[in-house]
Amino acid sequence: MPELPEVETSRRGIEPHLVGATILHAHIRNGRLRWPVSDEIYRLSDTPVLSVQRRAKYLLLELPDGWIIIHLGMSGSLRILPEALPAEKHDHVDLVMSNGKILRYTDPRRFGAWLWTKELEGHNVLAHLGPEPLSGEFNGEYLQQKCAKKKTAIKPWLMDNKLVVGVGNIYASESLFAAGIHPDRLASSLSTEECDLLARVIKAVLLRSIEQGGTTLKDFLQSDGKPGYFAQELQVYGRKGEPCRVCGTPIVATKHAQRATFYCRHCQK
């Protein structure tokens, strides 16, 4: 599933082609996504794009009369293409732009979403989200307050959007490795110093992934059709049985809440 770096990479890639241009019309080939494509999107015509923003894993296209909320789901990607390029099997939504470009949404598993809202505030998919991990609000003090009485393992807690948004399976595993924290540790067992380190490491890992265009493991592509290159820098995720790049101990894979977790027994305590 695309996580924060992949969604931010998509935002940065599509923004220059959308802001200041006008949506001539939307071409919906298959509106049966996780939730049906909103009727308002079908009716778009001669609508300027004012901004392209991100909240958590949602892309937000600001229009004069409302917002398009896009979620990439498990396998979605957005590309900027020449208008004449033929669609393929899993290309479900096109926004045809006045500058001769198309914003094309591709999603083999159709678990993403294209929604419409007049106002972002209070929308059900955005209403109960925690802070952005790259914001000043997310720091060691905040993390310690939220972990202090939490009797659950730190790995699934990091992936809870009520704690912090956008830290999914890949980046939770990578951040815990970088901080030297075992994923099975109770959140409440983390010291002040560990919380401070973990908050800083999460920011660093996410920023590095954004610099590399995100992580492509299967379906994710940047807006220009290229893969994300952070996969080449993964320390533990997807490396079961391979030697730790730091100490040589084989990487272990377990499951938390049906999600694969990767860690080094020697480096993470």
From Swiss-Prot:
GO terms for biological process: base-excision repair. Gene3D superfamilies: 1.10.8.50, MutM-like, N-terminal. InterPro entries: DNA_glyclase/AP_lyase_DNA-bd, DNA_glyclase_Znf_dom_DNA_BS, Formamido-pyr_DNA_Glyclase, FPG_cat, MutM-like_N-ter, Ribosomal_uS13-like_H2TH, Znf_DNA_glyclase/AP_lyase, Znf_FPG/IleRS. It holds the Pfam family Fapy_DNA_glyco. GO terms for molecular function: 8-oxo-7,8-dihydroguanine DNA N-glycosylase activity; class I DNA-(apurinic or apyrimidinic site) endonuclease activity; damaged DNA binding; zinc ion binding. It catalyses: Hydrolysis of DNA containing ring-opened 7-methylguanine residues, releasing 2,6-diamino-4-hydroxy-5-(N-methyl)formamidopyrimidine; 2'-deoxyribonucleotide-(2'-deoxyribose 5'-phosphate)-2'-deoxyribonucleotide-DNA = a 3'-end 2'-deoxyribonucleotide-(2,3-dehydro-2,3-deoxyribose 5'-phosphate)-DNA + a 5'-end 5'-phospho-2'-deoxyribonucleoside-DNA + H(+). Its EC number is 3.2.2.23, 4.2.99.18. A zinc finger (FPG-type) spans 235-269. DNA binds at residues 90, 109, 150. Keywords: DNA damage, DNA repair, DNA-binding, Glycosidase, Hydrolase, Lyase, Metal-binding, Multifunctional enzyme, Zinc, Zinc-finger. Belongs to the FPG family. This is Formamidopyrimidine-DNA glycosylase. The gene is mutM.
